[in-house]
Amino acid sequence: MDYVTLGRTEIKVCKNGFGALPIQRISFDSAKEILLHAYNSGINFFDTARFYTDSEEKIGYALSDVRDKIYIATKTAAQNADDFWKDLNTSLNNMKTDYIDIYQFHNPSFCPKPNDGTGLYEAMLEAKAQGKIRFIGLTNHRLAVAQEAIDSGLYDTIQFPFCYLATDKDIAIVENCKKNNLGFIAMKGLSGGLITNSAAAYAFMAQYDNVPVSYTHLRAHETRRHL
C-alpha cells in the first residue's frame, strides 16, 4: 500500500482513501464489515460528511475501537456559525470521537474567510482552539473557489474532483497545492462511474505523488472487491 503525506499537516494516509458516502445505503452490520475490511487491508483514511445521512454513525459503530490508528475527515454544509457548531457536535457524537482530523467546508459557493460576515471561518478557528478539529479543509467542484482557497493560505487541505479526464486547469490545482504545501485529496477518481478502466485510472493517479483518492463512486456491496 502506497502512502501520501497531506501537505503541511504531516498526516500520512494511504493512497486509496475510503469515501463513505455509499455506506449510507446498507445496514450497520454490513457497513461495519466493509469498513473493518478496509482498515485491515491498510486503509487509514476515511472521508464522510454530515450530509451523508447515517454514514458518520456507521463509522463510529465500526471504527471507534481503532480511532487512534485512523484519520477521519468529515464535512459541514453550514451557512452560519450556529449551524456549524450543531453539525460539528453531531459529527463528533456520531463517530464516537472527541476530535476530527480534517474538518471541511462542504462545497460552498464561496471561499469562507475571516470577516466575511458568515462567522464560519471564525468558528473553524475556535473549534481548532478547543481541540475538536486538527486541520481545516475545503471541498469544492469550482476551480475559482478551490484556487482562492489555495491562495488564501487559510486552508490545510483541498478536496477536488480529479481523474484522467482532468483538464489542464484541474491539474494546475493539484500542482498549486503541492507548491503551497497544501494537502490535496482527489474525489471522483473514476468520475462517478463514468471511467470503467480502473487500471488506467490508477496509472494516471500514480503520476502525482501528492494525491490520495477518496473513492466514493462504488456501490457499497462492491467495495470489498476493490480493496
Regions found by a protein language model. Name each.
Residues 11, 23, 76, 162, ...:
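Hydrophobic pocket-lining residues within nucleotide cofactor-binding pockets
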Residues 26-29, 36, 79-185, 190-193:
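Glycine/proline-rich, positively charged
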Residues 44-50, 73-74, 134-137, 157-160, ...:
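Short catalytic-loop micro-motif centered on adjacent basic/acidic residues
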Residues 59-62, 146-149, 224-227:
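Hydrophobic packing residues within well-ordered alpha-helices of enzyme cores
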Residues 199-204:
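Catalytic cores of alpha/beta
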Residues 216-223:
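Conserved small/polar residues in nucleotide/adenosyl-binding loops
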